Regions:
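Bacterial N-terminal signal peptides that target proteins for export
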Residues: 1-12
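Surface-exposed, proline-enriched loop/turn segments that connect beta strands in immunoglobulin-like
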Residues: 32-33
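N-terminal signal peptide c-region/cleavage motif recognized by signal peptidases
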Residues: 18-20
Length: 119
């Protein structure tokens, strides 16, 4: 009886410890923030996640006000938990879309909308 209980407890504890390692990367901060308004011109995007990100296999794309899509180059030398990229922005409404590949192989994706104003 005690052996089974102990085995069950060990299984539960090991499963709980392994769960975070299998979880997908979660976006914890971004520049711009969702819904933000930023000035026109050169802009540095920063997306920070709760785990290490594979910069080489992750993707960022920017949907411009006219509907065109620009695939952004991710800075290879960025922090291991961040995706960083530069773009020139004109006035209008944009959507930044990401596909972040966690170092463990899991992919998470999402998007955020923001506007650019002539300041």
């Amino acid at each position: 009886m005690y052996r089974r209980l102990r085995a069950a407890c060990v299984t539960v504890l090991l499963g709980a410890a392994a769960a975070p390692a299998c979880a997908q990367a979660v976006l914890v901060a971004s520049v711009p923030a969702p819904g933000a308004s930023v000035p026109a011109g050169e802009f540095a995007f920063h997306l920070r996640f709760n785990s290490l990100i594979d910069h080489e296999r992750s993707r960022l794309s920017l949907i411009h006000p006219d509907g065109s899509v620009e695939y952004l180059v991710i800075a290879e030398a960025g922090p291991p938990q961040e995706l960083i990229s530069l773009a020139r922005l004109a006035e209008g409404a944009y959507v930044l879309h990401w596909e972040a590949m966690q170092v463990g192989g899991h992919v998470t994706s999402g998007s955020l909308s923001f506007t650019v104003s002539a300041h």
